[in-house]
Curated annotation (Swiss-Prot):
Coiled coil: none annotated. One of its GO terms (molecular function) is metal ion binding. Its EC number is 1.14.99.60. Belongs to the COQ7 family. Binds 2 iron ions per subunit. The keyword Oxidoreductase applies. Its main location: membrane. Catalyzes the hydroxylation of 2-nonaprenyl-3-methyl-6-methoxy-1,4-benzoquinol during ubiquinone biosynthesis. This is 3-demethoxyubiquinol 3-hydroxylase. InterPro entries: COQ7_proteobact, Ferritin-like, Ferritin-like_SF, Ubq_synth_Coq7. Its cofactor is Fe cation. Transmembrane segments: none annotated.
Amino acid sequence: MFLDELISEFDRGLRSMTGVSRMSRPLPVPQESAVTEAAPELSPAERAHSAGLMRVNHVGEVCAQALYQAQKLATRSPSLRAVFNHAAIEEEDHLAWTAKRLEALDSRPSLLNPLWYTGALAIGLAAGRMGDRVSLGFMAETERQVEQHLDSHLEQLPEADRESRAIVEQMRVDEVEHGKAAMEAGGIELPFPVRGLMRAVSKVMTRTAYYI
């Protein structure tokens, strides 16, 4: 059984790194009520900026897959495995959505995805080794920081890029729920230095992924 699970997670990891992700939910689209007229064409600068932001979001989902796969494998609790697995499935939707949007913007995922994935996998295993409550706290803090990034992206994305905005808005809804579920399952608040280190690492990743 563990071997089957390991093979399944390995397959998911390969899909994460190669950009071949499965969608369990359809691609979010702008609400009809928000679309009163045809959106103007994005300028080359707006298209490039949207692509950079969506590439950052795609990298975040690559990392989320690795984190939750590692944490799922590290815990012995069936109920916590279910928590991590549910989050991973929805994050795989995010991965597929952002990949689709990058393609529509005539752009590409980060060239460093294997590096991001490997690093996040190691961090997830380390968090899992510290115990379930710490691991859940790490999940909650990760989602909290992702939520802040998405808020920032909603402020930065061009108003005309309704498609990207619809994706980011749904991602934000999901991330809030994942963080809430982690705390309700027994997660603890991480110490301030740990949260600060996570922000510093995230800043390096986002700045790099925007371009590469």
